[in-house]
């Protein structure tokens, strides 16, 4: 009977003893030194024992009834399975000594298979015939077996030719009684040492899933194609409180990033489902091999099948459920922008595997325990509008962590931000995953008698509650016992006073965000999420990411905001009840509002006739040390010192020029700077964006100046002496 295993079609690498679905060596985004350490630990030669990291692809029984009468037949079958993406690569360690070949579990080092040298009948390499370029083939037959097994291994770190030479030298020594193998191992050891010293850096881990051609795999239909172009008339697919919308290019870039995240998420879900299916298949094959056996002794190939049949851990199930929820959120967000397949088609692709995974778990309990990420209101509405009855029943069985949108979720305890880890090693940009303030749908409804003064302030300033149409009396938002105008003065309730100190510079990227400088102290208007709304001393307000904030101490707040023991708070809008005379009378209300508007217009006209008052606001002058693409090492060093990086970082990076520093990616900076590498990369990204914005602004000014000159030239040429300044029509 044929024994084979299959593989997921998604790219990537697995961790530990998990299967791998491609022929690419596992090159994660980790440190180069970690790669070398892993390589040296997996591929070793000591005395007469050698060890190689390989991937078990398949095991076939040489059986004419299975159309496998020879080694060539087995190779053809493997090529056929590989072309249909039905090969599942399982990481193992292949150990060769003077008595046997052993297969070990990568994680536990447990022995999976033991092939005594007399049972190894044949070995050969299969090069460049599959998507796996370097394959080792072994034919083994135990004394208890009627038919031999043919095993295939992908040699992903040491070439198959070297491994085969090692095995053949061990077989020759065993059969002929010679000692030729030590010399072979000596040459191999030198080659492995050379390879370790020149091990290449990791390839770029960021996949571009939507560039896959539709015919590449049977599962290509479950991948999102290129995003639809952003219509000129569409202001953006995010709800915003500001009238300033994202530029079309920025919006298109964001949609592209989110499409990429969606495709990576679908890849990982698909890989997990394929792994479950292959585990079930391996379990079935294992039982068939054990059938009819009188001895309890482990038979040939049963060790690898046992490893393949091992179910995923609970943590891996949780990870898959989290990615399913993330995919649902992204489908709802991108439903107007993706095609071939559409979001409505992909949601059915998600719920089919979800049903299989929950059945594998035995109950929906694990799925119910997964709260992060919460579904958005749009996602919940999207599911209600597209699920068929069977899928709706499954969804409802998962409970409120799947059905209750984040806008209705309690503020405390706060559900953490979900940052997925993909098998490919690609790290999604945090700015895409982090909820921007205009995407947050507000807080859960809390009874008014449970609102503390602090909570009341947060609710009041929440964008989604500022224009509430609910039957909540406006004055109920104010602290108990206060008058409607109690918050207009300069002495607010102590619980309302909160200041934070800025740890790093932050440059606003749109009208909703606020640019801040390191060590600046700002007043908190809204908190509790990834973005906090702050107000600076100049009265400007906007959103700032909370990971660059620290609680301000009393001495940090300083005198300007605390003169005479009084803390300044901007006047809040007065609250008024609707006069009873207008309640329920729409026409009267409109007439009243017209009168109010007329009154306001008169006041505004009167104000315009008054002498203009020039208010001058003192601002702290930031220390600005430019870093450009023309900067030399001295300017780079000064910029690093101004950003308060450690002396080691200044010493290591201060020898570079501006272009050299800008050319380093995040992983390269981490290798040089350690933990501070991420912050260096973040500061460089902000600086690069500032330079690009500055350059685009100057280019725009040149273009506008050129247009004005052209218009002036045209006007002067077409202006008559009698009507100077008026162009002829």
From Swiss-Prot:
Residue numbers spanned by region Disordered: 1-25, 182-247, 449-492, 695-729
GO molecular function terms attached to this record: actin filament binding; guanyl-nucleotide exchange factor activity
PROSITE patterns reported in the protein's UniProt record: PID (PS01179), SH3 (PS50002)
Compositional bias segments (type: Pro residues): 199-208
InterPro entries: EPS8-like, EPS8_2nd, EPS8_PTB, Eps8_SH3, PH-like_dom_sf, PTB, PTB/PI_dom, SAM/pointed_sf
Record-listed Phosphoserine modification sites: 242, 573
Biased composition (Basic and acidic residues): 236-247, 699-712
Keyword Cytoplasm: yes
Source taxon at top rank: Eukaryota
SMART domains in UniProt: PTB, SH3
Residue ranges with Polar residues bias: 713-722
Keyword Methyltransferase recorded: no
Alphabetized UniProt keyword annotations: Cell projection, Cytoplasm, Phosphoprotein, SH3 domain
Intracellular or extracellular location(s): Cytoplasm; Cell projection, Stereocilium
GO cellular component terms listed in the entry, alphabetical order: centrosome; cytosol; protein-containing complex; ruffle; ruffle membrane; stereocilium bundle; stereocilium tip
Function of the molecule: Stimulates guanine exchange activity of SOS1. May play a role in membrane ruffling and remodeling of the actin cytoskeleton. In the cochlea, is required for stereocilia maintenance in adult hair cells.
Family named by the database record: Belongs to the EPS8 family.
Self-association state and partner proteins as the record states: Interacts with ABI1. Part of a complex that contains SOS1, ABI1 and EPS8L2. Associates with F-actin.
Protein name from the UniProt record: Epidermal growth factor receptor kinase substrate 8-like protein 2
Organism: Mus musculus
Lineage: Eukaryota, Metazoa, Chordata, Craniata, Vertebrata
């Amino acid at each position: 009977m044929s024994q084979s295993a299959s593989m997921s079609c998604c790219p990537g690498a697995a961790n530990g003893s998990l299967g791998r679905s491609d022929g690419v060596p596992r090159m994660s985004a980790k440190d180069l030194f970690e790669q070398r350490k892993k390589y040296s630990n997996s591929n070793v030669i000591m005395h007469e024992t050698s060890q190689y990291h390989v991937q078990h692809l398949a095991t076939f029984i040489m059986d004419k009834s299975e159309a496998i009468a020879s080694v060539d037949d087995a190779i053809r079958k493997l090529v056929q399975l590989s072309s249909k993406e039905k090969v599942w690569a399982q990481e193992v360690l292949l150990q060769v000594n003077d008595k046997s070949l052993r297969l070990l579990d990568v994680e536990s080092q447990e022995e999976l298979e033991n092939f005594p040298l007399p049972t190894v009948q044949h070995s050969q390499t299969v090069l460049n015939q599959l998507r796996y370029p370097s394959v080792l083939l072994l034919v083994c037959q135990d004394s208890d077996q009627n038919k031999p097994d043919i095993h295939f291994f992908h040699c992903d770190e040491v070439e198959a030719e070297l491994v085969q030479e090692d095995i053949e030298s061990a077989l020759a020594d065993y059969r002929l009684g010679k000692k030729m193998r030590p010399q072979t191992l000596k040459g191999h050891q030198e080659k492995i040492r050379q390879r370790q010293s020149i091990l290449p850096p990791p390839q770029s881990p960021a996949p571009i899933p939507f560039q896959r051609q539709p015919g590449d795999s049977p599962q290509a239909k479950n991948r999102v194609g290129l995003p639809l172009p952003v219509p000129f008339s569409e202001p953006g697919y995010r709800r915003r409180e500001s009238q300033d919308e994202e530029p079309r290019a920025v919006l298109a870039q964001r949609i592209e990033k989110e499409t990429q995240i969606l495709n990576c998420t679908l890849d990982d879900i698909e890989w997990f489902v394929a792994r479950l299916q292959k585990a079930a298949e391996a379990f079935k094959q294992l039982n068939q091999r054990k059938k009819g056996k009188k001895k309890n002794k482990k038979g040939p190939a049963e060790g690898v099948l046992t490893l393949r049949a091992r179910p995923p851990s609970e943590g891996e199930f949780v990870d898959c459920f989290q990615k399913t929820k993330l995919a649902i959120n992204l489908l709802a967000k991108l439903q107007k922008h993706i095609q071939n397949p559409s979001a409505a088609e992909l949601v059915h692709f998600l719920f089919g595997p979800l049903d299989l995974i929950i059945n594998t778990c035995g109950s929906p309990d694990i799925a119910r325990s997964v709260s992060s990420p919460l579904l958005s209101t749009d996602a919940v509405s999207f599911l209600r509008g597209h699920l068929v009855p069977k899928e709706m029943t499954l969804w409802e069985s998962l409970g409120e962590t799947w059905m209750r949108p984040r806008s209705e979720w309690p503020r405390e305890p706060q559900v953490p931000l979900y940052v997925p880890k993909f098998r490919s090693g690609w790290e999604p940009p945090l700015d895409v995953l982090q909820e921007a303030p205009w995407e947050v749908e507000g807080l859960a409804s809390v009874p008014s008698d449970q609102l503390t003064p602090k909570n009341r302030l947060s609710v009041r300033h929440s964008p989604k509650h500022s224009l509430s149409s609910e039957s909540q009396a406006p004055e109920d938002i104010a602290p108990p016992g206060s008058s409607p105008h109690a918050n207009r003065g300069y002495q607010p309730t102590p619980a309302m006073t909160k200041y934070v100190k800025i740890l790093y510079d932050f440059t606003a990227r749109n009208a909703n965000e606020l640019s801040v400088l390191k060590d600046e102290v700002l007043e908190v208007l809204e908190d509790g999420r990834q973005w906090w709304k702050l107000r600076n001393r100049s009265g400007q307000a906007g959103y700032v990411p909370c990971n660059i904030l620290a609680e301000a101490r009393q001495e940090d707040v300083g005198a300007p905001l605390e003169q005479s023991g009084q803390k300044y708070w901007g006047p809040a809008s007065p609250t008024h009840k609707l006069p009873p005379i207008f309640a329920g009378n729409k026409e009267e209300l409109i007439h009243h509002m017209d009168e109010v508007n007329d009154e306001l217009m008169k006041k505004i006209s009167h104000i315009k006739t008054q002498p203009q008052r020039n208010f001058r606001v003192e601002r702290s002058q930031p220390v600005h040390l430019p870093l450009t693409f023309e900067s030399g090492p001295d300017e780079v060093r000064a910029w690093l010192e101004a950003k308060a990086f450690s002396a080691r970082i200044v010493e290591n990076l201060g020898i570079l020029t501006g272009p050299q520093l800008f050319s380093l990616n995040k992983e390269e900076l981490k290798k040089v700077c350690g933990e501070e590498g991420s912050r260096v990369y973040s500061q460089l990204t902000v600086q690069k964006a500032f330079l690009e914005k500055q350059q685009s602004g100057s280019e725009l000014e040149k273009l506008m100046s050129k247009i004005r000159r052209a218009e002036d030239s045209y006007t002067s040429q077409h202006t008559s002496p009698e009507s100077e300044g008026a162009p002829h029509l």
